[in-house]
């Protein structure tokens, strides 16, 4: 069995014909978040995926097997919710509540897409949004500062915040004095109906 252990950086340009000839590895979003995976190429060949921990594959990524052969990643069709709203305010409110629950979301023109979840569908309907179940590829937003790893919401927030701070320091230097104190109280109850209470005090 061949092992796929490398991902070519997105900024590396490859000949289109070379990529087109590569066999596809079609995976749903949840599988694309796993760095260790037994998978099957579209050709029927079984392969082992062994990538650096924290890797999240995206549609169009190009991987390299241990024999040097290329494999291209394709996002599989899966059960999703398409969320639309009669006005921008309602759609923004829907996006806010999804973000508050740390739900992966793909943002489109006038539409939000997320993994199928009947509880979220009910919540969004109560907010005034129109929710449609569909089968489509799902490719949610990566972290705003490059953090796209799916470690759980606390790790993702910490990762993005650290990267944001790094970018700020690079642009503004390290000689600024900051007189901000932050108190964060998080009340997280994990389970089927995960509720999140966030209290942020800034002064």
Curated annotation (Swiss-Prot):
Disulfide bonds: none annotated. Keywords: Chaperone, Cytoplasm, Nickel, Nickel insertion. Its main location: cytoplasm. GO terms for biological process: protein folding; protein-containing complex assembly; urea metabolic process. GO terms for molecular function: nickel cation binding; unfolded protein binding. It holds the Pfam family UreE_C. Residues 170-203 are annotated as: Disordered. It comes from the Bacteria. Gene3D superfamilies: Urease metallochaperone UreE, N-terminal domain, UreE, C-terminal domain. It is found in: Cytoplasm. GO terms for cellular component: cytoplasm. Involved in urease metallocenter assembly. Binds nickel. Probably functions as a nickel donor during metallocenter assembly. Belongs to the UreE family. This is Urease accessory protein UreE. It comes from Burkholderia mallei (strain SAVP1). The gene is ureE.
């Amino acid at each position: 069995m061949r092992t796929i252990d490398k991902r070519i950086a997105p900024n590396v340009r490859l000949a289109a014909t070379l990529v087109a000839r590569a066999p596809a590895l079609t995976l749903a979003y949840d599988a694309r978040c796993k760095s260790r995976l037994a998978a099957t190429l579209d050709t029927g060949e079984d392969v082992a995926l062994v990538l650096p921990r924290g890797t999240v594959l995206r549609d169009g990524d190009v991987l390299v097997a241990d024999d040097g052969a290329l494999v291209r990643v394709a996002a599989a069709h899966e059960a999703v919710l398409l969320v639309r709203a009669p006005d921008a305010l309602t759609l923004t409110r829907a996006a806010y509540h999804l973000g508050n629950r740390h739900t992966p979301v793909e943002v489109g023109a006038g539409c939000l897409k997320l993994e199928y979840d009947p509880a979220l569908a009910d919540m969004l309907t109560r907010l005034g949004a129109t929710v449609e179940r569909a089968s489509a590829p799902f490719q949610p937003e990566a972290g705003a500062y490059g953090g796209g790893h799916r470690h759980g919401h606390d790790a993702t927030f910490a990762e993005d915040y650290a990267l944001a701070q790094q970018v700020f320091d690079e642009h503004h230097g390290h000689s600024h004095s900051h007189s901000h104190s932050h108190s964060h109280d998080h009340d997280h109850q994990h389970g089927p109906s995960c509720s999140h209470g966030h209290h942020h005090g800034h002064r």
